[in-house]
UniProtKB/Swiss-Prot annotation:
InterPro entries: Frm2/Hbn1, Nitroreductase, Nitroreductase-like. Its EC number is 1.-.-.-. Pfam families: Nitroreductase (PF00881). Its cofactor is FMN. The lineage of its organism: Eukaryota, Fungi, Dikarya, Ascomycota, Saccharomycotina. It comes from Saccharomyces cerevisiae (strain ATCC 204508 / S288c). This is Putative nitroreductase HBN1. Belongs to the nitroreductase family. The gene is HBN1. The modification N-acetylserine is found at S2.
Amino acid sequence: MSAVATYLKTLTARRTIYALKPELPGEITINDIQSVVQTIIKETPTAFNSQPNRAVILTGETHKKVWDEVTKAIESPAGQKRPASARDEAFGSVIFFTDDKVTEKLKADFPAYAAAFPSFADHTSGAAQINSWVALEAMGLGGHLQHYNGYIKAALPSKIPESWTVQAQLVFGTPAAPPGEKTYIKNDVEIFN
């Protein structure tokens, strides 16, 4: 199988999996996950090589405490279901950030592009998120991406720098059930010569 075919197979295998068990599969350790996420944060392309991506991994009591605070902060019982399942059914969460100090420095250094830099930071964060999700899936983990950003920021340990803006949460664990069927829209990529 060619490298591209292997890459595409890995990419298409990545699915949203909500049914998780709070354990790691096989011989996978949290240090393996940390190493993979660290490499992805380092190697994901960024505008002007600015490297604004940051990440932390929550496990154990910290993972449960953060998601418990998120659950309690949401008033609607229906709205509490997803963060409660993240707390109770997942092994951990990768919390993705962008460092606003980096974005502000870019704005000052390159004022002609100042309005674009926040979007550039969002784009590179999205790239790091999907790269991490695909990699964790390839390791045998299941996961789902969440965006309880303000709630998460308020619940995180105090040693997280204030300049870090929460972008997303990749909740992960061992899959407890296969993903549901995925449907596709017609969305052909056209070639114009």
